[in-house]
Amino acid sequence: MKQIVYVASPESQQIHVWQLSDAGALELLQTVEAPGQVQPMAIHPDRTHLYVGVRPAFGIVSYRIEADGTLQQAGMAPLPGSPTHISTDLQGRYLFSASYSGNCASVSPIGHDGVVVAPIQQIDGLTAPHSANIDPTNQLLLVPCLKEDRIRLFNLDLQGELTPHTQEAVTTASGAGPRHMAFHHNDKYAYCVNELDGTVDVFAISENGGKYTLVQTLDIMPADFNGTRWAADIHITPNGRFLYTSDRTASILTIFSVSEDGSTLSVVGYHPTEEQPRGFNIDHSGRFVISSGQKSGHIGVYEIDQASGKLTTLARYPVGKGPMWVSILAK
């Protein structure tokens, strides 16, 4: 399996393209000078295009992914607000954007050529939405609204239109600040990291995918931590055995084991990472974590112990300024 790692560095307006070896080493393939401050990224399900949200001219840049993993710009399209998080539906027909500062979410069609075009829908009235996450049925979009302490739920129809779900929202603890999400591969459980109180919530998903119920909340910080909690990102291994979160104040990755059915998390430990880890990801083999240090200007590579989930630091690599997003492609 050939794997390509994309790292977005907004302060230098660059995307660094790396090849990940089976041993966890990175080789730089390309440095892309981007048309703006590159922030969130998403890969098309068919692995032919990479989408990048940019500012200050709010928009999406579509890049064609070449056979070797390098990028060629294929198009640009506007967005209604500064893109905080982007994702696609599971079929690659629509791109969703959440704008924290714009208090909105939007839907943009993806053409047959893989290029994103202008939005067909904008949903206003969201307070600080931080991500847009399609559920395993591809029929429900979950939008954590950090300042509402709610995850808003929207039905997605075949024409790409979002409408409020019958369960309009899932409520978190007061002051939690829901931010990013991950799903178990069995489609029965979802996980949300909460930025402000430094916790992770586990939600049970009903059989038809129509209802989310909170079943567990766990602290992501060590017991002796007394600073300001500032959680950022969350990812689960492809086999569903281990889940990881990041905190930017302590600059740590927290390691959780996941019960076989996905319903219960247990803290395994904590691993130091690059300074201010706003974004990280797990490779498709489930063997490596790659974490970006927004203040260090580096990415760190960590090997996952397949029995415990604990991390071993392998290496660190310089990237651009303010790296904040990591996306990984398997070819």
Curated annotation (Swiss-Prot):
Its EC number is 3.1.1.31. GO terms for molecular function: 6-phosphogluconolactonase activity. Transmembrane segments: none annotated. It catalyses: 6-phospho-D-glucono-1,5-lactone + H2O = 6-phospho-D-gluconate + H(+). Pathway: Carbohydrate degradation; pentose phosphate pathway; D-ribulose 5-phosphate from D-glucose 6-phosphate (oxidative stage): step 2/3. It comes from the Bacteria. One of its GO terms (cellular component) is cytosol. Keywords: Carbohydrate metabolism, Glucose metabolism, Hydrolase. It is an enzyme of class 3 (hydrolase). SUPFAM superfamilies: Nitrous oxide reductase, N-terminal domain (SSF50974). One of its GO terms (biological process) is glucose metabolic process. Catalyzes the hydrolysis of 6-phosphogluconolactone to 6-phosphogluconate. Belongs to the cycloisomerase 2 family. NCBIfam families: PRK11028.1 (NF008258). This is 6-phosphogluconolactonase. It comes from Serratia proteamaculans (strain 568). The gene is pgl.
